[in-house]
Amino acid sequence: MTGIALYAPAPPRPALVASPGRVVLDGTTKALVHVAAPRGHQVIDVSLAPYALDLRGRPRLGGGAHAPRWVSARPLHLRVGPAGAVVTLAAAPPRGAVPGDRPFALVLTTRGVRGKSVAVRLRIGVLVIAHVRGKVVRRLVIGPVVARSGRLVELTIRNTGNAVERLARGRLVLTLLRRGRVVVRLHPPPRELLPRSRAVIVTRLPRSLHGPATVRVSLGSFVHRYPLRL
């Protein structure tokens, strides 16, 4: 009897990595981001760019506010290899700066290799939140709730405060009721809402339902019922 061992190929090493993937600059402070190129040496251009989340929570560069002028990244160009190098972020908010969180991205872009007919450039981003100390305003506007195709329930939430809001799993609960009885409880996946942004939370019912119903939305001390037609 002959045995054959099957080995899955190792996943390819990424061409460019950065750690940590999220940085908080609290007041006047500095933070270090380690950048490495596991596949070989790369020349990297460093910049700061607007950062936003779309309605479904997917990150994108652009569309948000620019990085504050009092935040800097150094160096602006560096050569990195497998051992890596460090980019230093520094924040120095001026006196009178408006309190709150300011999200943006540290963008790392590889340069194309000279002599190749097609120059491939790789770009990755690190989320940076510059926090100005002072009065923190936490304000979420919840609703409306809309049904789609009998199985999808969409909840809109707006963050009108000045701080990033993180909705951990279990913090937000949607309970579907019919004739006062609980049909199902929905626990949306974790989400993050940037200041002055809007999010659409989509949850799927375990089965197709039709007719009138009520959705009870619970988020911390907030509890409200919304009529719904499936």
Regions flagged by a language model, labelled:
Residues L6-G40, R139-E154:
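Beta-sheet-dominated interaction scaffolds and their linkers
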Residues P11-P20, R39-T88, A168-V183:
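Surface-exposed binding patches on compact interaction domains or structured appendages
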Residues L25, H77-A85, P190-A199:
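Short proline/glycine- and polar residue-rich coil/turn motifs
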Residues D26-L32, G84-V87, A97-A105, S149-V153:
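Short, solvent-exposed loop/turn segments enriched in Ser/Thr/Gly
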Residues L32, V86-T88, R198-P206:
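Exposed aromatic-hydrophobic patches
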Residues P38, Q42, A49-A52, L61, ...:
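Terminal connector regions
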Residues N159-A163:
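Short amphipathic, basic-aromatic surface patches that mediate peripheral association
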Residues R178-P188, V223-Y226:
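Surface-exposed loop/edge segments in extracytoplasmic proteins
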